[in-house]
């Protein structure tokens, strides 16, 4: 527990030697004291984030992991300018042991980043974001204690949302405008040799 922020971490077994969890969080609370200062009565500044992880050992050769991250930052100056952004990530990973020298990881990852600007003086706000889906398959092969080969496939689908601009009052001169979404796919094969 700190003066302007605190963090919490909990971890432990759900089922002994099979399933475990981790939960962590962090948050600031300085904004709760800002109203005590007369000149900054309408200002805000805070953040929070949460981390979660669940692991389950299916058998001697297979373990699955599910994890997530959620975070947000907010900065508001007397309702004149408001900035808020956050990210959400979910990750599923399957670890498979082929032998004591070869193992693989199959991962599916979802990420969503959003950003909001509210221009109080200009009476409009702007919301934008980036979403991506990532599928990757990695293998590691230990030839001996000194030599390791890594190889795999990776593909990412992107959705870029340049934003929605909209008036916040009836008096605003800004017109509603939805900017066109953009899409992209990035795929790769990689290999490396570590000695």
Roles of regions detected by a PLM:
Residues 55-72, 84-195:
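Face-selective signature of the C-terminal outer-membrane beta-barrel domain
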């Amino acid at each position: 527990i700190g003066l302007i922020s605190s963090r919490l971490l909990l971890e432990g077994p759900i089922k002994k030697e099979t399933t475990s969890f981790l939960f962590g969080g962090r948050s600031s609370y300085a904004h709760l004291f800002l109203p005590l200062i007369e000149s900054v009565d309408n200002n805000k500044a805070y953040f929070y984030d949460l981390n979660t992880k669940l692991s389950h050992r299916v058998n001697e050769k297979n373990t699955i992991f599910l994890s997530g991250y959620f975070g947000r930052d907010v900065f508001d100056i007397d309702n004149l300018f408001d900035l808020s952004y956050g990210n959400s990530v979910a990750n599923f990973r399957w670890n498979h042991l082929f032998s004591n020298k070869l193992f693989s990881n199959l991962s599916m990852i979802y990420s969503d980043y959003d950003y909001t600007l509210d221009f109080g003086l200009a009476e409009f706000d702007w919301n934008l974001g980036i979403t991506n889906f990532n599928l990757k398959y990695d293998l590691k092969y230990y030839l001996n204690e000194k030599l390791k080969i890594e190889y795999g496939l990776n593909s990412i689908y992107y959705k870029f949302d340049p934003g929605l601009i909209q008036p916040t009052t009836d008096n605003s001169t800004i017109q509603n405008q939805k900017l066109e979404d953009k899409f992209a796919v990035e795929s790769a094969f990689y290999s490396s040799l570590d000695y």
